[in-house]
Amino acid sequence: MEVDIYPLRSPDLADAIEGALGEGSLFHKTHGYYAQGVGPGTAILPKDWLTRVHRVQNGNTNDRIGYCVDVVDLFLSKAVAGRDKDREFCMALLEHRYVSSPQLLELVPSMPITNEEQRALRARIRRWAKSQRDVGHDMPNAQHLDK
């Protein structure tokens, strides 16, 4: 398992994160997961993604504060990337109803991609949601899938 860490206020720390917590590190061997330091260009996210992050702070974080990208923004980023592993992840998010296609389609215009890429992204979301519906998974508000 991996975790991407983006040091928002200090992007130059991404390499240090990779070295200390990256794949094959002592941290990875000890805890069974690793972290990759990422920068602002690693993921394509909707313009307003920072308004939807989730704050994480508790005893497990030694009361340090971290923010997690909202699942809708994560889905869109992975759908734009379009790799096989991203498709599988996105399909699981749809199947288990962590996201809905209307919710996703509403955010497509805020993606910093070309109009043509936005059209392709909308088609991909509809295709994936329709394939989930067609194998028997409940897709709420799925009327738009047959258009």
Question: Model segments located where?
Answer:
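Compositionally biased terminal segments of proteins
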Residues: 1-147
